[in-house]
Amino acid sequence: MMLIDGKKVSTDLKNELKTRVEELKAKAGCVPGLTVIIVGEDPASQVYVRNKAKSCKETGMNSTVIELPAETTQEELLGKIEALNQDPDVHGILVQQPLPSHIEEYAVTMAIDPAKDVDGFHPENVGQMVLGNLDKCFISCTPFGILELLRRYDIETRGKHCVVVGRSNIVGKPMANLMLQKLRETNCTVTVCHSATQNMPELTRQADILIAAIGRANFITREMVKPGAVVIDVGINRIEDPSRKSGFRLAGDVDFDNVAEMASAITPVPGGVGPMTIAMLLKNTLQSFARSHNL
């Protein structure tokens, strides 16, 4: 069984991005800038934002965090976004989820300039991705990171059966669409399973590549996996664990220890897909910068 080490790949990628940032800085006289907006004081969101800022610094990019109180109105937030849309020093805009209930996520997504939508959530970017115009869009960071893992580990995908478990707008839907594309890392026959799927184990056992993104700890069991399958675990679930100082431990959507005995390759949690998401966010930001300077 081969362990797909997202932590190592993300470190390698960030080193490559750092070199590229230095090259582009010499040509443009400035560096890429990412601005993250966080509304409210969700502890998990604050951790994610700190990690993004740290990664920006490591690659030589500028990072700005705008912290807004939970009572910020939707109009105020949209005004902040519009100002960033017009700022030439900002090449990537990210609004950290979740948002307070009185703010409509779709309105926020629509407000971000597609050319700075480095999360890849704007309908213009999603549409270009579905059409296969990948050089004209930003790809959602988690699916993009999974493609990078498949490429760097030279996992054969052409003509393989890929089963995606989950249909979220952030992972499941874009992942399924990407695996259909005619790329070296994709070109699969794709099945999508979700909460209403009947006989799910029968379908997942057909997968040469199984991608779990359902948000339920240890949902994918040994009995649901074909021997020799490649298993990609997107889930990050907190499970109570009194033996840990934090009081919890992280678990994926896959029962790792048992499924690893069946798989030819598998991603761990933590240290698999998670680190890749931030790395691809930085890659998208660098791409936005390069486009804005015609580099």
Curated annotation (Swiss-Prot):
The record's listing under CDD domains reads:
NAD_bind_m-THF_DH_Cyclohyd
Matching entries from Pfam families are given as: THF_DHG_CYH, THF_DHG_CYH_C
> Known EC number(s)?
1.5.1.5, 3.5.4.9
Q: Which residues bind NADP(+)?
A: 166-168, 195, 236
The molecular function terms of the Gene Ontology recorded here are: methenyltetrahydrofolate cyclohydrolase activity; methylenetetrahydrofolate dehydrogenase (NADP+) activity
Q: Which cysteines are joined by disulfide bonds?
A: none
Pathway noted in the entry? One-carbon metabolism; tetrahydrofolate interconversion
What's a BP term from Gene Ontology annotated to this protein? methionine biosynthetic process
Q: Which PROSITE patterns match?
A: THF_DHG_CYH_2 (PS00767)
Keyword annotations for this protein, in alphabetical order, are:
Amino-acid biosynthesis, Histidine biosynthesis, Hydrolase, Methionine biosynthesis, Multifunctional enzyme, NADP, One-carbon metabolism, Oxidoreductase, Purine biosynthesis
Judging by the UniProt lineage, the source's domain of life is: Bacteria
**What Gene3D superfamilies does UniProt report for this protein, alphabetically?**
Leucine Dehydrogenase, chain A, domain 1, NAD(P)-binding Rossmann-like Domain
- Would you name any one GO CC term? cytosol
Q: Which reaction does it catalyse?
A: (6R)-5,10-methylene-5,6,7,8-tetrahydrofolate + NADP(+) = (6R)-5,10-methenyltetrahydrofolate + NADPH; (6R)-5,10-methenyltetrahydrofolate + H2O = (6R)-10-formyltetrahydrofolate + H(+)
Subunit info?
Homodimer.
Please give the HAMAP family that the UniProt record associates with this protein: THF_DHG_CYH
What exactly does this protein do? Catalyzes the oxidation of 5,10-methylenetetrahydrofolate to 5,10-methenyltetrahydrofolate and then the hydrolysis of 5,10-methenyltetrahydrofolate to 10-formyltetrahydrofolate.
Family classification: Belongs to the tetrahydrofolate dehydrogenase/cyclohydrolase family.
Protein's UniProt name: Bifunctional protein FolD
Name the gene that codes for it: folD
